[in-house]
């Protein structure tokens, strides 16, 4: 298994509560991330709170595959969202999102750590980095058109 971390941030013209609500409400995520097909709330809760099963599309060259992963929302406060993601085989991602007021909006800062099997790691890590960068842009666009 390998582990590596990265960070991303973006300025959003909105208030902290709105951004936190969008990030923590996974029923909104199909509007934000186009590869998500379905979001289902699990009847089994995680240790900290809500658990979701996400069905999305994995692109590999000209091929598309449906995949599933699980998201546990560990905690939500007025300025943070902490989640853990599990995708088979043995891939784990933790995400601590912090919201800091800045001027006329907020700075959304994500600290992401991924752990995955050695053979999958480089591919999965690069896809994860690209996905999170794209998601930040989409969150920004979604939130700013809602306010």
Predicted segments — roles?
Residues 40-88, 134, 138-146:
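Glycine-rich portal/gate segments that line the openings of hydrophobic small-molecule binding cavities
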Residues 14, 77-78, 103:
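Residue-level signal for tight coil/turn positions that link beta-strands
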């Amino acid at each position: 298994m390998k582990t590596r971390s990265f960070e991303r941030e973006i300025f959003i013209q909105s208030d902290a509560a709105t951004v936190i609500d969008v990030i923590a409400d996974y029923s909104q995520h199909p509007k934000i991330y186009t590869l998500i097909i379905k979001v289902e709330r699990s009847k089994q809760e995680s240790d900290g709170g809500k658990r979701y099963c996400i069905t999305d599309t994995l692109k590999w060259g000209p091929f598309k595959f449906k995949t599933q992963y699980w998201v546990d929302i560990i905690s939500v406060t007025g300025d943070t969202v902490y989640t853990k993601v599990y995708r088979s085989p043995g891939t784990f991602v933790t995400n601590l999102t912090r919201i800091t007021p800045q001027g006329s909006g907020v700075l959304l800062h994500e600290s992401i750590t991924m752990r995955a099997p050695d053979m999958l790691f480089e591919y999965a890590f690069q896809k994860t980095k690209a996905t999170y960068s794209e998601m930040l842009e989409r969150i920004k666009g979604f939130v700013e058109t809602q306010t």
